[in-house]
């Protein structure tokens, strides 16, 4: 009996010792590792701001285990790239074991050093791998972009952190030489003016925005060829259509004769495109919006509170809440515009267009009702909700709204005096309802407009196509395709 027990113990011990034999690694120089790519490429990256992380996979497709004797950045510790190998950060790693049919993760980032160039510049490095005296490389590339950095340095209770970029009685101009990258809010102080010249690119970090305080002035002076663009500060392709990357353009009341103006701008991928609201007093100067696209905001495209707006040749598209919310009363004229809300990032339960005439005073907290007057001419207001128009008016003040020669998605057709020569719940037939709001061949918006609203600066559409005597509804005039 004891004899068999000792034999069993010996067998078990032999099994354990055989299991604990160290793995063997081949030194055959004909065996090589493989990679998921031969080049890790980054999109344009602002100097001093780190990039997102790229992933590189190392594969051992051989039947034998291998030992990578060295992984290193050719630029060493001076490289603008950084790597993380299996959870460890550094610029050089030694003796990494990779078993047969196994893999190793390598994560790569880049932080570009600033220089004196205005245009994007190319940087490059190499990852060098040595295995059994074989040297293999993976190229790392990126484009760096110098920028003007605006970093918030002041804070007042109840307001976001900000930096004054145009102080009282000061006119500041931003130009297109280098992009502007804003952390926090860039603030235009009372009686200050910011002029943004054609082609300027303004990028906001998460939560950042542009803020014109009471009696300050913003003038955006883009052109058809060189619009001014407001967007987030992540330049990778992944973020190109990602909403909610920054906060908003926030415009308080301007002084008479010095109203805000936005011409040829693209405002995209924020929380609110434009928030225009009275703060200390009733607005005395209109906000003029012309030839401007406001697209892809998680909240609202245009949000107002007791304001005066004239908007023309505009597109407001794809917003997670209202496309346009005009609240607290005010005076509004919208002409030759397209509101197209086909938001798909989340469930939208609000209409594209909302009106009310009540305003909560920020100082005494009381709710007040004000006059509300709205006019929409030669426009399209459509979306993927069955009801895209809602009002909430308190009795007392004058409240009027009228739509002329427009396409509207609504069931609120309860008063003929509010609508003149409009089409209801008729698909406007865009070229692409999510991406391209030009009119398709069979669009009912073709010829729907009234020529009296297409005069002056509105003789030409958002693409500077002449409308002639038969204008279409919306921001874009239909142009027939000429077959050769």
Residue ranges and their predicted role:
Residues 134, 467-471:
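Extracellular interaction modules
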Residues 15-18:
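C-terminal motif of bacterial Sec signal peptides marking the signal peptidase cleavage site
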Residues 4-13:
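Sec-dependent N-terminal signal peptides
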Residues 51-53, 63-68:
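Short acidic/proline- and small/hydrophobic-mixed sequence motifs that coincide with surface turns
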């Amino acid at each position: 009996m004891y004899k068999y027990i000792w034999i069993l113990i010996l067998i078990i011990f032999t099994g354990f010792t055989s299991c604990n034999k160290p793995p063997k690694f081949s030194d055959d120089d004909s065996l090589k590792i493989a990679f998921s790519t031969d080049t890790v490429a980054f999109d344009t990256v602002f100097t001093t701001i780190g990039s997102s992380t790229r992933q590189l996979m190392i594969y051992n497709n051989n039947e034998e285990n291998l030992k990578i004797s060295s992984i290193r950045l050719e630029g060493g510790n001076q490289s603008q790239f950084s790597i993380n190998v299996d959870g460890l950060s550094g610029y050089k790693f030694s003796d990494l074991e990779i078993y047969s049919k196994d893999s190793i993760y390598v994560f790569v980032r880049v932080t570009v050093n600033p220089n004196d160039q205005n245009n994007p510049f190319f940087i490059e490095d190499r990852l060098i791998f040595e295995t059994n005296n074989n040297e293999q490389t993976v190229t790392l590339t990126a484009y760096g972009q110098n920028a003007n950095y605006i970093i918030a340095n002041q804070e007042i209770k109840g307001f976001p952190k900000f930096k004054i970029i145009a102080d009282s009685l000061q006119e500041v101009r931003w130009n297109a030489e280098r992009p502007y990258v804003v952390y926090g809010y860039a603030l235009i102080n009372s009686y200050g003016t910011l002029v943004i010249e054609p082609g300027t690119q303004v990028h906001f970090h998460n939560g950042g925005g542009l803020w014109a305080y009471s009696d300050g002035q913003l003038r955006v002076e883009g052109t058809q060829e060189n619009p001014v663009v407001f967007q987030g500060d992540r330049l990778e392709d992944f973020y190109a259509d990602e909403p909610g990357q920054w906060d908003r353009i926030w415009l308080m009341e301007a002084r008479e004769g010095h109203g805000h103006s936005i011409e040829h701008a693209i405002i995209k991928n924020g929380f609110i495109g434009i928030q225009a609201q009275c703060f200390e007093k009733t607005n005395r100067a209109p906000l003029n919006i012309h030839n401007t696209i406001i697209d892809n905001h998680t909240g609202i495209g245009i949000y107002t509170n007791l304001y005066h707006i004239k908007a023309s040749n505009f597109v407001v598209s794809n917003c997670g809440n209202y496309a346009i919310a005009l609240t607290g009363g005010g005076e509004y004229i919208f002409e030759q515009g397209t509101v197209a809300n086909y938001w798909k990032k989340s469930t939208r339960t609000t209409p594209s267009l909302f009106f009310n005439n009540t305003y909560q005073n920020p100082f005494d907290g009381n709710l007040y009702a004000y006059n509300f007057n709205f006019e929409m001419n030669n426009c399209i207001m459509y979306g993927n909700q069955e009801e895209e128009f809602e009002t909430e008016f308190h009795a007392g003040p004058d409240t009027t709204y009228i739509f002329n020669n427009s396409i509207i998605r609504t069931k609120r057709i309860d008063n003929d005096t509010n609508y003149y020569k409009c089409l209801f719940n008729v698909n406007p037939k865009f070229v692409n309802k999510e991406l391209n709001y030009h009119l398709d061949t069979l669009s009912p918006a073709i010829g729907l407009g009234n020529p009296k609203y297409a005069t002056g600066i509105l003789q030409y559409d958002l693409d500077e196509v002449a409308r002639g005597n038969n204008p279409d509804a919306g921001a874009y005039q239909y142009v027939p395709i000429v077959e050769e």
